[in-house]
């Protein structure tokens, strides 16, 4: 894939032409006094954050349960060294609470990064340990990727114990980004053997791999290797984000190559500002059967993950996705990624 620099965060004067008909035509009764969120029935969030300084893992699980969600995959959670163990504790607490409230608990799954932080080598043994413990999704490098450091910089305290913990660098030159961050390719532009081994492990254990924040060469190499080994659970997180930065045509190609496109509320948030009309165009181009909708929420500048999902689903419905397509992207496809068997792939209200 050639390097591209698309801009899908259209100016307000442009996006208002498509957004006003959408917002005026979409109706959803929302009572702010409710103790749950409407409009997220059966949804599975495959990208939820609950680590230090973010939303509470048990609290968001309770809200998801009350709101009728089917499940949450925690990308991050307090206790990152043992995410499966931490999620097991949250699950136990949720089940006890649900027994008191006579509610059916939402499913909870652990995810894990393939890294153990900046300056640490990516070791297959780490991922093998997480998969054995019950992790269902592995994330390639995100904030620790060389690509991220070259685009937005990072917190130098992560690689320099004497640095100000509140400091954040400017974007780093590529040679510095490579010094402190992770890069998945060898000197010949091929996936490092350790990365290929992790893909094979995930394939053998029916786990997903989220591609993280790759450069285009890294992305292309992961896509090719997924095809080579017949891997069906390669997920392209937030494809509009500057850390992935695909064009809509590239998203269509990725879907045709067997990858999942995981669109997120983060992309639509004011912090990234993607025009929801363009996200809808991407879904229509790639096909809802290749797409998922998730929150990528948890930080205090966002709504909680349950409300973020309501908003994301609402935006896509307002711009033209049908109820069946929303169900496919929010329930059927995420269920495949986390390995949940559904009783039916048809939404409960279909045919009524």
Language model region names:
Residues 1-107, 125-128:
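An N-terminally biased module of ancient metal coordination in phosphate/nucleic-acid-related enzymes
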Residues 2-4, 15-17, 306-352:
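Mid-to-C-terminal alpha-helical segments outside catalytic/metal-binding sites
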Residues 29-39, 58-65, 86-98, 122-134, ...:
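Histidine/acidic residue-rich metal-binding segments in metalloenzymes
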Residues 41-58, 109-120, 185-190, 212:
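Active-site mouth loops of central-metabolism enzymes
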Residues 45, 60-83, 103-116, 135-145, ...:
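Divalent metal-dependent hydrolysis catalytic cores, especially in the metallo-beta-lactamase
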Residues 48-50, 77-78, 113, 142-143, ...:
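Active-site metal-binding loops of divalent metal-dependent hydrolases
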Residues 258-270:
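His/Asp/Glu-enriched short active-site or ligand-binding loop at hydrolase and phosphoryl-transfer sites
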Residues 264, 288-305:
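Short acidic/histidine-rich active-site segments
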